[in-house]
Amino acid sequence: MAERTARLLLLTVTVGLAWGSQGDREPVYRDCVLRCEERNCSGDALKHFRSLQPIYMSLAGWTCRDDCKYECMWITVGLYLQEGHRVPQFHGKWPFSRFLFIQEPASAVASLLNGLASLVMLCRYRASVPASSPMYHTCMAFAWVSLNAWFWSTVFHTRDTDLTEKMDYFCASAVILHSIYLCCVRTVGLQHPSVARAFGATLLLMLLLHTSYLSLVRFDYSYNMMANVAIGLVNLAWWLAWCLRNHRRLPHTRKCVAVVLLLQGLSLLELLDFPPLFWVLDAHAIWHISTIPVHVLFFRFLEDDSLYLLKESEAKFKLD
């Protein structure tokens, strides 16, 4: 549904980390980066660096300065551990061991698997649900929006840049808003299509204004987090209220209830925020992995509900 919603509800207090963390504020780290850049990132030294850099690293956008930050991060971590201190974060993130050009291997793979699950369920939905089902096109659009979000999540965890960060955040917001629209169509729009169209246009305008402000005015992490928390609460509450009201008449709504409750429960994994195991697997990656079956379950609900609506519409047509 909106896998990131539950996580957003728990991360509000950590927004400040995006602006700086203990590790990157350390004089040892700053001095190390400065010396590394002076030594390696200009003139003949830079040419030498580029000649030795693997092609996949340069294609992924890894620069000499990025490599300096990466190497100095591990030097700083080593000093912390040597002195018996807790592993620090850098730029709002734990230190991760890079694999090839992938910055956060476990989260990137987990995002990719979520995307593949979305693709498989999209194909399954299209194969099992006729296009004449009242919710077919809305559900298909939601599947594509979800697939796009997981693509950018994979890219972001592969290579964290300003662009990939924004696309990850914006596409996550789009998924939540489209889930709200999906719920609106299911609960109101089938009886009042004009209401759903007007509501959908409003949500689209909200997304446009949200992304425009963050892109053109100021990327405010706190505002972005609070905005997503607000729409996430609306999304979860609306789906849960509708499911509980209709669970006796529509047994398949239990799958949707399970999705909402599981997402809330699994989001507690984020509270376990700990340095990555083997410098690869952190709580966020585990959370991403755990959402794969939940994602599949929600698409199963959409499939069951669409087939129910098709059967209901065909029965009404025969009566008419």
UniProtKB/Swiss-Prot annotation:
Cytoplasmic topological domain residue ranges: 120-135, 191-198, 245-258, 304-320
Lumenal side: 21-98, 157-169, 220-223, 280-282
Pfam families: Per1
Chief localization: Golgi
Transmembrane is among the record's keywords: yes
Bilayer-spanning residue ranges: 99-119, 136-156, 170-190, 199-219, 224-244, 259-279, 283-303
Entry EC number(s): 3.1.1.-
InterPro entries linked: Per1-like (IPR007217)
Subcellular location: Golgi apparatus membrane
Keyword Manganese in record: no
Glycan attachment positions: N40
Signal peptide boundaries: 1-20
GO molecular function: hydrolase activity, acting on ester bonds
BP term (GO), one: GPI anchor biosynthetic process
GO cellular component: endoplasmic reticulum membrane; Golgi membrane
Membrane topology annotation: Multi-pass membrane protein
Task performed by this protein: Involved in the fatty acid remodeling steps of GPI-anchor maturation where the unsaturated acyl chain at sn-2 of inositol phosphate is replaced by a saturated stearoyl chain. May catalyze the first step of the fatty acid remodeling, by removing the unsaturated acyl chain at sn-2 of inositol phosphate, generating a lyso-GPI intermediate. The fatty acid remodeling steps is critical for the integration of GPI-APs into lipid rafts.
Listed name of the protein: GPI-specific phospholipase A2-like PGAP3
Natural source organism: Cricetulus griseus
High-level lineage: Eukaryota, Metazoa, Chordata, Craniata, Vertebrata
